[in-house]
Amino acid sequence: MEEDESTTPKKKSDSQLNLPPSMNRPTVSLESRINRLIDSNHYHSPSKPIYSDRFIPSRSGSNFALFDLASSSPNKKDGKEDGAGSYASLLKTALFGPVTPEKSDVVNGFSPSGNIFRFKTETQRSLNLYPPFDSDVVSGVSPSPVKSPRKILRSPYKVLDAPALQDDFYLNLVDWSAQNVLAVGLGNCVYLWNACSSKVTKLCDLGVDETVCSVGWALRGTHLAIGTSSGTVQIWDVLRCKNIRTMEGHRLRVGALAWSSSVLSSGSRDKSILQRDIRTQEDHVSKLKGHKSEICGLKWSSDNRELASGGNDNKLFVWNQHSTQPVLRFCEHAAAVKAIAWSPHHFGLLASGGGTADRCIRFWNTTTNTHLNCVDTNSQVCNLVWSKNVNELVSTHGYSQNQIIVWKYPTMSKLATLTGHSYRVLYLAVSPDGQTIVTGAGDETLRFWNVFPSPKSQSRESEIGALSFGRTTIR
């Protein structure tokens, strides 16, 4: 016999509410409505704003925590559950959603508005979208992508034979022009190698009584200066392969040359430096004295205001355009100073390297006359050159590894160590685009290495870095 559901009492289930006698028991229909409301609050999409009537506020968007729906009695005994409070709490959750703020939160300032009623449901944004100490949240910018270290090939991409290339520490027999032509002094001859066409041209032959001791290109790459063992300096027009001038003044061999616009500086074993203006008829316009031994290194700064000279007396001097005495004297090196290089990135930054007894690369600030840093390379420093594309420099060395080292400045961390020469690497020059270096040694070879990035890639990386640093979230 079937019983009528309206008259037959139902068994108590765990899902029903346990209410005190003082309250009326909710009907099944009310309980089912509460469950439906809870489900709708749990699974509705927060992406769509819900609008209510202009006179009827939105329940889920209103701040009901500003007043108590169910204030608890202060005379309650600890440990006893108030059934009326539980039911009211459940009802509030069903009607207003599970994320209704508490009154304490509103008082403490967590509520964005002090209004109780709202007429639009705003999309809730979680406070835990980011870690509490996320750098992006703190700074408001996206971190720059981690830059992978640049790969430098450990082997030369080209090797040229250079017979009769002298193994003499005090000479400078290799230079690369702005026209992409390499000049090399081999014995008593000078050869030109065109990097674009790989064509080799014999520029001159000094004869059996003289040898080439130094070569140096003018800035435009149309004229080449040649220092000889007799003390003369010859100026050659490379387009016509013609000697247009021979200048005297030194008594001994000329092992170092440096151009500054129309002024040519020459350093000799006679311990002097001659300043020659090729626009005048005089062989030299001034004579610089200060070194006590052979001049083996000469370099003008990029702004042509200062001339650095290194000698076999272990001294590094700095001269200005008008002085006949050095304006700065650096005496920290313990061996001959041939390796000299001015930074193209920092005004007044000068690097120098010492010979076998010194083995150090030192950095100087010529504007403040200060010694900045010293790096022990553990081998003879034969030559130095800065990259014009990046803040890096290359050093070439002698005993015992005859290595070539690429350094990152100012950390002086080694980016690459290149080996291959069997004799000390005495000669070094950079291509006009700043990407390739050529090294020469007493093993009678010239080796070409790709060590520096191109100017375009470097500028592109700078742009990307700047854009990454300034990137913010678009709202």
Curated annotation (Swiss-Prot):
Ranges where the record places region Disordered: 1-27
UniProt pathway annotation: Protein modification; protein ubiquitination
Subcellular location as annotated: Nucleus
PROSITE patterns named among the record's database cross-references: WD_REPEATS_1 (PS00678), WD_REPEATS_2 (PS50082), WD_REPEATS_REGION (PS50294)
MF GO annotations: anaphase-promoting complex binding; ubiquitin-protein transferase activator activity
Tissues expressing this chain: Expressed in the root tip, predominantly in the root cap, quiescent center cells, surrounding stem cells and columella.
GO cellular component: cytoplasm; nucleus
KW Zinc (keyword) present: no
Polar residues bias: start-end ranges: 15-27
Keywords, comma-separated and alphabetical: Cell cycle, Cell division, Mitosis, Nucleus, Repeat, Ubl conjugation pathway, WD repeat
Description of the deletion phenotype: Stunted plants. Impaired root growth and smaller root meristem.
Chief location: nucleus
Similarity remark: Belongs to the WD repeat CDC20/Fizzy family.
Note: FZR2 controls the induction of early rounds of endoreduplication while the remaining rounds may be mediated by FZR1 and FZR3. FZR1 and FZR2 are functional homologs, and their functional divergence in root development arises from the different expression patterns.
Record's function text: Activator protein that regulates the ubiquitin ligase activity and substrate specificity of the anaphase promoting complex/cyclosome (APC/C). Required for meristem organization and maintenance of quiescent center identity and stem cells.
Protein's name according to its UniProt entry: Protein FIZZY-RELATED 1
Organism whose genome encodes this protein: Arabidopsis thaliana
